[in-house]
Amino acid sequence: MHKGIVAAALLLSTSTFALAQQDRATDITAAQVQQVLKAPSKIVDHTLKVVDLGNYQLSVAVIKRGPTRAPGAAAPARAPDPKAVKCGLTAMPAGAKEASDGGIIHDSTDETYIVISGSGTLITGGQILNGTRSAPDSEVTKVLNGPSCSGKIVGNFVARKVTVGDISVIPAGVAHGWSDITTEVTYLSVRPDPKKVLEHGYVNPAIK
């Protein structure tokens, strides 16, 4: 099942952009996805490959998230980064609701999520409060999503339960995050890169 989902993921979003003629297909096998998931890593988001399709690049990633913190539990304290560039709202709008966990907005990268294991609550919409810009030389900017803003999600967001087989399309500029993950959720993310900001020809080290 996973092999078929990976193949389908590579074909998603192609109708959105005009393509230059390509002379070969790119494959990502189910075994390669598992290799990346099993490789030691301090992050949950792993780009598998970035493919140049002429007018744009297409990135395919796999993400495995563990349990989210319990409702009402305090988020772990982080030391402030004096070099960090702020983004998003600076004050909570009157009457706005607040998501229990943080989220992110990508400047120019759409995402299509395809859940392959587990379940959780996907939150989309709203705005980022007291956010931080991804650094120009960070993995988020160069390999994962391009320039982004992460922080607390507030405002008129939508929360829905997603499970194996569910697909969600998240446009660039739309805040998104997760909550209520009891054990884990694993999903593929297909990311068109119209500005070609991601590392050209990137292949995850675990499958080189």
Regions found by a protein language model. Name each.
Residues 183-201:
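A short hydrophobic beta-strand segment most commonly corresponding to one strand
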Residues 19-105, 200-208:
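A short, N-terminal "cap"/entry segment at the start of jelly-roll beta-barrel domains
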Residues 153-157:
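Short alpha-helix capping/helix-loop boundary micro-motifs
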